[in-house]
Regions:
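Flexible C-terminal active-site loop/helix
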Residues: 61-72, 81-89, 96-101, 114-115, ...
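Positively charged N-terminal leader segments that act as targeting/secretion signals
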Residues: 2, 6-8, 12-13, 34-35
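Active-site mouth loops of central-metabolism enzymes
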Residues: 221-236, 286
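Conserved, mostly hydrophobic/aromatic
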Residues: 130, 193, 206, 284, ...
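Catalytic core of soluble alpha/beta enzymes
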Residues: 254-386
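Alpha/beta enzyme core
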Residues: 238-247, 297-303
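Metal- or metallocofactor-binding catalytic centers and their adjacent structured scaffolds
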Residues: 73, 88-92, 125-204
Length: 457
């Protein structure tokens, strides 16, 4: 007889006896020999043991919920092992010439020279898995060379990092340049890199960035600034206003802040009459009023049904802006000159404006911009990002309160693609990421460039 368990033998004998007592006439069952009965018994024991084991396991989970157990997992790779890696980074410094020198109130008060060009700092990033991203920062007048130089100093820290770990990379770049702080050129050098990483992230997902962020809308109401600068004669301003409306713009912003405040009122009156009573109109003083002038001009401008009065005071005068916002019915907008999340935090928590106007390239990229958006939304502020509509369209589309987008055609020659303006709104395209690629003209305007890693395209 084979070596079988005692339990199997006893169980087999029990079955054998029970069957003979219950069915004495079933001779065919009696012909099963003892070994076969024992195998049957062992099979029953095996099945029963597994059932009891499962029940016991369930009972132990219930009865011993304070006990710990650790599953042994094999053959599974971690995210760190399978993640993508940054293999190549290119930085470029280009200078975009302006056809006509631009003057606002800062020029007329002698604080700045007319603007003749815009420095553009570009980051192009490629990953091991073949994904690419493009981002940019900028500077008007001085600063472009410094932003590019600092970006060049810290860019090699990107190599080998997973491009999806945007927050980790941002922190690493901040610490690489910790000696120069966390605002101003220090973060403006990170901006093109951070924007490029978000562009890559959305491209990888196969989505426009607005959709990746969770868009609240597919288009954003849009206003024009470039037609209303102080260097532009009033008759040309009125022609620009008419052309903008014909092109589908949703609002007009007029520059103010001249030493002769009566001239501001004269130009504003003419533009309001040309637009009609209800067409959206804004004014921008570019920080050129003191508190007394700001309240006096603000009261005079109440009659013009303005969407907002922008930068009536120095950008860092949080208290003065708060007093003005509380005193006027016309909303106050400010924030474009601030260069960090912390500065915007002071503005928002200080109730200094009705509209916040962060600029992603200036505050350090999309990552800090999203934090500003979140804080502003929690405090009920409206959003009107400054400049860089190619980036801000996506961010504004993801803001919970209806925002405004600033239309500036200056950067159009840099990109192969253009944004659609229709029915007073700028529309998010179905192109993945930010939805733009660099033009040959952008390459021709490039004066400096550097590369890190190896391009494997």
């Amino acid at each position: 007889m084979p070596d079988i368990t005692r339990e199997g033998i006893m169980l087999a004998l029990s079955f054998h006896c029970a069957i003979r007592q219950k069915h004495p006439d079933c001779d065919h069952l009696y012909k099963i020999d003892s070994t076969q009965w024992c195998f049957i018994g062992i099979l029953v024991i095996y099945v029963s043991a597994n059932i009891l084991s499962d029940e016991g396991h369930a009972m132990s989970l219930s009865a011993n919920s304070d006990a710990v157990s650790y599953a042994s997992v094999t053959g599974v790779k971690t995210a760190a092992e399978t993640g993508d890696r940054i293999e190549w980074v290119k930085l470029s410094l280009a200078f975009l010439p302006l056809a006509t020198p631009v003057s606002d109130a800062k020029v007329l008060t002698g604080r700045q020279k007319p603007l003749t060009e815009v420095a553009i700092i570009i980051a192009e990033i490629r990953s091991r898995d073949g994904f690419e991203g493009v981002g940019f920062s900028y500077s008007k007048r001085a600063g472009g060379q410094g932003i590019y130089a600092h970006a060049k100093e810290i860019a090699d820290n990107l190599l080998g990092e997973d491009p999806n770990d945007i927050d980790k990379i941002y922190s690493k770049l901040l610490w690489a340049g910790a000696s120069v702080g966390r605002s101003g050129m220090a973060v403006q050098a990170i901006s093109p890199i951070d924007i490029a990483l978000w562009d890559m992230k959305a491209r990888r997902a196969g989505l426009p960035l607005a959709k990746l962020l969770g868009a609240h809308r597919d288009s954003v109401q849009c206003y024009n600034t470039s037609g209303g600068f102080l260097h532009t004669p009033l008759d040309q301003v009125l022609k620009n206003v008419a052309l903008s409306r014909e092109s589908g713009i949703g609002g007009i912003k007029l520059k103010v802040g001249q030493p002769n405040t009566a001239e501001d009122i004269r130009r504003l009156t003419a533009v309001r009459e040309a637009l009609g009573e209800d067409f959206p109109l804004m004014v921008d003083a570019n920080q050129q009023w003191d508190r007394e002038t700001a309240i006096r001009m603000g009261r005079k401008m109440e009659a013009f049904n303005l969407i907002w009065i922008e930068e009536p005071l120095d950008a860092y005068d949080v208290e003065g802006h708060a007093q003005l916002a509380a005193a006027l019915d016309t909303p106050i907008a400010t924030g474009e000159m601030l260069t960090s999340f912390r500065e915007h935090e002071q503005l928002i928590l200080g109730n200094a404006s009705d509209f916040v106007q962060p600029d992603a390239p200036r505050v350090g990229g999309i990552s800090p911009f999203l934090k500003i958006m979140d804080l502003a939304a929690k405090h009920g502020r409206k959003l009107a990002p400054h400049f860089a509509m190619e980036v801000h369209l996506h961010l504004a589309a993801a803001y919970p309160l209806e925002p405004w987008l600033e239309h500036f055609e200056w950067l159009n020659p840099l990109f192969n693609e253009q944004l659609e303006l229709r029915d007073g709104r700028m529309w998010v395209s179905d192109r993945h990421g930010l939805g733009f690629t660099l033009s040959e003209q952008a390459r021709k305007w490039t004066q400096l460039s550097c590369e890190f890693g190896k391009y494997a395209g």
